[in-house]
Amino acid sequence: SMENNLLAIMYQAAKEIIAVSYKYNVPTNQFSFSYNKELQEEVETIIANLRELIEDYTETLAVATHTDEKEHIISFINRESHGKTLVDRINAYTTQFKKELEVAIASGVLLNVAEGELLSSIKESRKSPLFNRHIRQATSQGFPVISRLKVPETYGVGRTNSSFTALDNLTNFAIAEGWMDYFAMIAQKSGAIGFMSFRGSSYPCQQCDDETTYFHVFSNGDPVPPYHAHCCCYIVPVSY
């Protein structure tokens, strides 16, 4: 699954960043990636590699066995939506991940935590990274690591403050979009003029309910599910 792949590559990157951070002799109470130019460059290289891996995994799983329409699907999931592309969002969330790692490593350095133990705590707190046990311990001992490194504690109402959750939602949504776009394309090639949308779950959702109330016409550009993250709706094509 994308979640398992994402977990593996994000925490391989975290392991590498912890190792290079511990390699440089940065004063414990002043730790930041930018304190040392070589450290900063090594971290940026690891994050750039992570971004490429996330893009590759997402595109591969979105295309899956539908290689006959590979270029169309990749172009579709990489289109601009609400002013940003898939790559823009991956870049933003991996930058957020880098900041989460920076504050966790700063805490680990202060507390003299072993590399393996620090990595374990980062994995454990991936869904609420600023509640990492070492960050909390450093803060309770009077080291304001979160504010010193200027890490936002919230990204706004309804938005996760976890880069892992954000990337998991984003990539799974893109993969689902790729599959549904292919399904709609094949339906049109087979003579379908539109579709009805049906709920795939009983979870209360006004948007999904609304989409079931009318006949969607392909030529109108009517939206195909998923309509939002975790959407379980599906379509039934309709021909003349």
Outline where the language-model segments fall.
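Acidic, glycine-rich two-metal-ion catalytic cores of nucleic acid-processing enzymes
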Residues: 146-240
